[in-house]
Regions:
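Extracytoplasmic loops and strand-loop junctions of Gram-negative outer membrane beta-barrel proteins
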Residues: 2-5, 20-22, 103-112, 162-164, ...
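Outer-membrane beta-barrel proteins
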Residues: 4, 30-32, 44-50, 90, ...
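Conserved small-residue
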Residues: 7-13, 17, 24-116
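Hydrophobic, lipid-facing positions within transmembrane beta-strands of outer-membrane proteins
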Residues: 15-21, 120-126, 133, 209-214
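Repeated loop/turn-to-beta-strand initiation elements of outer-membrane beta-barrel proteins
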Residues: 17, 29, 132-136, 221-222
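Transmembrane beta-strands of outer-membrane beta-barrel pores
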Residues: 23-25, 39-45, 130-132, 139-145, ...
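Transmembrane beta-strands of outer-membrane beta-barrel proteins
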Residues: 33-35, 124, 130-137
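Extracytoplasmic gating/loop element in the C-terminal half of outer-membrane beta-barrel translocons
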Residues: 142-226
Length: 226
């Protein structure tokens, strides 16, 4: 018998704004300064999802895709709350915001409200020329995106001790003489790694210099003599 069927349902709304701009701030015979900007802003949300209804909040949702009114691929996680100084176990928040070492993954996960795709991205830079000398730059940026850091998560995996290279941050792990720390115990018998959470959910915003170049253009008269 058929218990489920795939269907193309739901609506993804995208509200975009794109900008491309180049402006000459200075322009004369000897000097030219041009600023350029390229950018995109995207606001998306889901609607008309005929899926599961959260028994607590009543929200319509598809775990892994999103919920009505939220961004696509929104994270749905148990919230990580640090380390229990008494025993080194991981601490979490239940749905009501109470601390617990043993969250229920069926009832204590909450929607993050964060985007896993950029809200804004683009580049900007300037071109400066003065009597043949020039400087050119470009910066790239991404804003409004949070994603799980799988690489760092793997480097902090205590089950890989003595098998693979791991992060030096594990040296800060909880011990009876190091109780105030942000790294849980690595001792067996703890709850570390037992629960999926947003512990390694990381803001991925960045501003990076893509390139910078400096040079000199030989005058045409000089080139004609070569």
């Amino acid at each position: 018998s058929v218990t489920s069927i795939n269907a193309n349902t739901g609506t993804l709304h995208n509200n975009d704004f794109d900008l491309e701009l180049a402006y000459d701030i200075i322009r004369n015979n000897d000097m030219k300064l041009t600023v350029n900007v390229v950018g995109n802003v995207n606001d998306n949300y889901l609607d008309d999802l005929p899926a599961d209804v959260d028994p607590v909040t009543g929200e319509v949702q598809i775990v892994g895709i999103g919920r009505n009114g939220g961004p696509i691929f929104e994270r749905f996680d148990v919230r990580y709350a640090g380390v229990n100084p008494a025993n080194g176990n991981e601490l979490f928040l239940d749905r009501d915001g109470n601390l617990t070492e043993n969250p229920n993954p069926d009832t204590d996960r909450v929607w993050s409200g964060l985007n896993t795709t950029p809200e804004a991205q683009g580049s900007f830079g300037f071109n400066f020329d003065y009597k043949g000398f020039f400087i050119q730059t470009q910066f790239n940026y991404v804003l409004g995106v949070d994603q799980l850091d799988f690489d760092y998560s793997a480097l902090m995996d205590v089950t890989s001790i003595s098998q693979f290279n791991l992060s030096a941050d594990l040296l800060r792990s909880w011990t009876p003489t190091n109780r105030i720390t942000d790294v849980p115990t690595i001792q067996p018998g703890s709850n570390v790694g037992n629960f999926a959470s947003n512990r390694f959910l990381t803001n991925k915003d960045f501003l990076r210099l893509r390139f910078a170049s400096v040079g000199y253009n030989l005058p045409k008269k000089t080139l004609d003599k070569i």
